[in-house]
């Protein structure tokens, strides 16, 4: 009889350990799926109102590209060297020219310009045309840049104010 109670006790302990994990997975899965709906994955392609929809797979690849090429200075969409200029959609839309679209961001990554668009910052900001600053950027091709732009433009939709929101969210 004692061994029966010991066996039941071990089974109950195992169930109490596994059950919260199962419940947690069943609760979090729909939320994870919801963040990748078509609306979230659709962003402005250019300044003319055209739209482009990325796939979940493209954004996951883009996330890796961003983390390995951009996150050193732009972790969570904050600009380490100038926290007044983040990668949130509002800041991108107020840049000149606007960078709140794929074409605008790709052009910036190829030829970095000041926030007001007045002069090149290729000497201080990594980009395809940068000379000695973070030369790893020069290995990125147009498709890589397109994916990184898509990631930046979808990140705020997924992460909310934590993307580009500054250190109050960390």
Swiss-Prot record:
Binds 1 heme c group covalently per subunit. PSII is composed of 1 copy each of membrane proteins PsbA, PsbB, PsbC, PsbD, PsbE, PsbF, PsbH, PsbI, PsbJ, PsbK, PsbL, PsbM, PsbT, PsbX, PsbY, Psb30/Ycf12, peripheral proteins PsbO, CyanoQ (PsbQ), PsbU, PsbV and a large number of cofactors. It forms dimeric complexes. It comes from Prochlorococcus marinus (strain MIT 9313). It comes from the Bacteria. It is a peripheral membrane protein. One of its GO terms (biological process) is photosynthesis, light reaction. One of its GO terms (cellular component) is plasma membrane-derived thylakoid membrane. It is found in: Cellular thylakoid membrane. One of its GO terms (molecular function) is heme binding. PROSITE patterns: CYTC. Keywords: Electron transport, Heme, Iron, Membrane, Metal-binding, Photosynthesis, Photosystem II, Signal, Thylakoid, Transport. This is Photosystem II extrinsic protein V. Its cofactor is heme c. Residues 1-33 form the signal peptide. NCBIfam families: PS_II_C550. Its main location: membrane. HAMAP family: PSII_Cyt550 (MF_01378). The lineage of its organism: Bacteria, Bacillati, Cyanobacteriota, Cyanophyceae, Synechococcales. Belongs to the cytochrome c family. PsbV subfamily. One of the extrinsic, lumenal subunits of photosystem II (PSII). PSII is a light-driven water plastoquinone oxidoreductase, using light energy to abstract electrons from H(2)O, generating a proton gradient subsequently used for ATP formation. The extrinsic proteins stabilize the structure of photosystem II oxygen-evolving complex (OEC), the ion environment of oxygen evolution and protect the OEC against heat-induced inactivation. Low-potential cytochrome c that plays a role in the OEC of PSII. Heme c binds at residues 70, 73-74, 125.
